[in-house]
Amino acid sequence: MKYSSLIIFLLKEHRIKTGIGFEAFGWYAVLISNPHEEPSKWKMQYIEGQETYGFIVGSSAVLKDEKYLYAYGAVEPATHEVYLLRWKLDEAYTGNLANPEWWINGKWAERKTLKPVPEPLFIGGTEYSVHYDSSLKKYIQIQSFGFGEGKIGIRMSDSLQGKWTEPFMFYTPEYPGVKSPFMYAAKAHPELPGKGIYITYNVNSFDFSELAENQTIYFPKFILMRIVKNDED
């Protein structure tokens, strides 16, 4: 069955007096019934996310197969444990995102209580990507690591649920001419054609005046990554 609607997951954020001044504390989704029209004409149904015990559903990757819609995310604030939730497509595309199934202890199950806290898939970040690479026959996860002048790393898995490899750091950005830089939100864009996988990341500054004045930052930076398959592994 073909589904013509579009589902977008949204973060709920509020101001705080520490750190970078805000944090995520919940999630919403919006169901757009006519996504092929101009955005100003979209018919949108906002769906308030249910209790997910600090897990921000859909803050990162969203995928689907023939039966289910899957959403990754991370526990906020700060701890970033990663889980995977799913809904039947028929339910998701009619706006029913209640009662998702969680991948917990090797099986799909509903989660009704905060404790016991399930084992996460891995420790991730608020924003990252997951996609399937048909040439490698692997799921690939890309994220930024570290808060500040960090690195970009990759994990791989045979399935959406894992087991995921340990992260491999493959790129360290440079920040010429940027005062007090920090890097975040690395993710892959497999939909872009090229001899490899295009990856974007963002650069910002802890110095607000630098953010306001430096027109080279706060725009996505692109790199091209090529993965060479090792037949012995």
Residue ranges and their predicted role:
Residues 2-6, 10-53, 65-68, 73-123, ...:
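Beta-rich carbohydrate-recognition and catalytic domains
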Residues 190:
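Charged/polar, solvent-exposed surface patches and flexible loops
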